[in-house]
């Protein structure tokens, strides 16, 4: 009898222990399925993803200064074209046709033909190409500004998602969340309102040239080299960042998983549906199947729409600028050669005060100090060579040319 009582008590005790153990297992399972979802959520690395985004944003904003400088230079080249026309006209009419020179160059007909030929190139650059260059410049600056804004917007949301406690952040390093002073290519360091660098902050922009605007250089800014291309902070097992967590109770839906991937920065990163935000890597953010919870785009210029558009508009501007620069060089060299031949044919030897190019300074065109004085002196020379009647005909031809300018 005593043995039965003891056996009953042991059985009852074991049953209680089993029930207790089952409760513990249920609780543990609950936290594994729910609570640990947020515990796994990683954060974007400060030295990797965040700095790459800010570097790219600053480069895109620097497009404004780049376009402004190139447009100004091209405009100056056209002005030098105009000055060249004036100077060549003056110097040609000074070569007296019947004083041992080539009559074709010194006749009114020869002058008019020469100016019409070279003047048409000036008109094409000034009226068509320069106008188009300005338009393409506006488009390039606008597209680059939109792209920079998308990246800034992403940084602003993710950086501000943090708690004062250690380890609760969405952008940071192994110790703490990222501060403004750690992202100086994004934020104004002297601002207390999380203000970003704007196009007007020219002294904060980088000096860029064509070599900095290639597809390769832009992609290099956004290439993650550390951690095997992982955009997440690898020294923090859990940053408790719900922005990388797309499961129920994460940063997007309270009771359900997201049905599709989530894109940030127009696709610079992609969050897998029902991902816990723990595994990160580099790949195609718009691929049909995402391997990583958090994927960083491997080819941003091609696959991120705002960056692709910014690059495309910028290349249009750069290509047209290169064409104008080449045309200026070729036309200037051609003019100088023809003028030099004319001087040789007339037996007149030029010096530094008369030649079109100053070889010592290397300047392609002579900029006139007083355009009106030169024009008046040139007209008197034309009248002296051609006679009053013929000068009227020449002036009509030249007047048509001036209308083109």
UniProtKB/Swiss-Prot annotation:
Residues annotated as glycosylated are: 55, 104, 256, 351
Q: Where is the lipid attached (GPI-anchor amidated alanine)?
A: 391
Q: Got a GO cellular component term for this one?
A: plasma membrane
Q: How does it sit in the membrane?
A: Lipid-anchor; GPI-anchor
One Gene Ontology term of the biological-process aspect is: symbiont-mediated evasion of host immune response
Which of UniProt's keywords are assigned here? Answer: Cell membrane, Glycoprotein, GPI-anchor, Lipoprotein, Membrane, Signal
Q: Which residues form the propeptide?
A: 392-405
- Is Protein biosynthesis set as a keyword in this record? no
> What does the UniProt entry say about where the protein is found?
Cell membrane
Pfam family of this protein, just one?
A: Trypan_glycop
* Superkingdom field: Eukaryota
Q: Where is the signal peptide?
A: 1-50
Q: What is this protein called?
A: Protein PAG1
Q: Which organism is it from?
A: Trypanosoma brucei brucei
Record gene name: PAG1
């Amino acid at each position: 009898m005593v043995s039965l009582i003891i056996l009953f008590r042991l059985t009852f005790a074991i049953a209680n222990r089993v029930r207790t153990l089952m409760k513990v297992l249920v609780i543990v399972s609950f936290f594994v399925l729910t609570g640990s979802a947020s515990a796994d959520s990683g954060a974007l690395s400060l030295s990797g993803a965040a700095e790459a985004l800010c570097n790219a944003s600053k480069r895109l904003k620097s497009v404004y200064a780049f376009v402004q400088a190139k447009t100004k230079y091209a405009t100056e080249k056209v002005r030098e074209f105009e000055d060249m026309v004036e100077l060549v006209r003056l110097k040609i009419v000074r070569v007296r046709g019947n004083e041992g020179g080539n009559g074709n160059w010194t006749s009114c007909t020869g002058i008019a033909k020469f100016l019409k030929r070279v003047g048409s190139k000036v008109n094409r650059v000034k009226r068509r190409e320069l106008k188009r260059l300005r338009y393409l410049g506006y488009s390039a600056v606008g597209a680059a500004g939109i792209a920079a804004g998308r990246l800034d917007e992403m940084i602003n949301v993710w950086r501000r998602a943090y708690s004062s406690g250690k380890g609760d952040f969405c952008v940071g390093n192994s110790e703490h969340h990222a501060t403004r002073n750690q992202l100086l290519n994004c934020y104004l360091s002297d601002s207390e309102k999380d203000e970003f660098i704007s196009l007007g902050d020219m002294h904060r922009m980088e000096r860029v040239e064509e070599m900095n605007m290639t597809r390769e250089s832009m992609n290099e800014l956004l290439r993650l080299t550390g951690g095997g291309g992982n955009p997440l902070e690898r020294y923090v097992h859990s940053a408790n960042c719900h922005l990388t967590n797309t499961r129920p109770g994460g940063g997007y839906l309270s009771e359900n998983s997201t049905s599709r991937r989530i894109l940030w920065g127009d696709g610079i990163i992609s969050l897998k549906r029902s991902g816990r935000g723990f595994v990160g890597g580099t790949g195609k953010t718009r691929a049909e199947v995402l391997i990583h919870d958090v994927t960083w785009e491997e080819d941003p210029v091609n696959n991120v729409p705002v960056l692709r558009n910014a690059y495309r508009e910028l290349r249009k501007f750069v290509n047209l600028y290169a064409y104008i620069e080449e045309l200026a060089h070729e036309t200037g060299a051609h003019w100088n050669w023809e003028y030099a031949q004319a001087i040789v044919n007339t037996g007149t030897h030029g010096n530094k005060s008369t030649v079109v190019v100053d070889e010592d300074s290397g300047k392609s065109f002579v900029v006139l100090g007083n355009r009106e004085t030169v024009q008046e002196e040139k007209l008197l020379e034309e009248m002296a060579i051609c006679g009053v009647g013929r000068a009227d005909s020449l002036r009509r031809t030249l007047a048509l040319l001036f209308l083109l300018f």
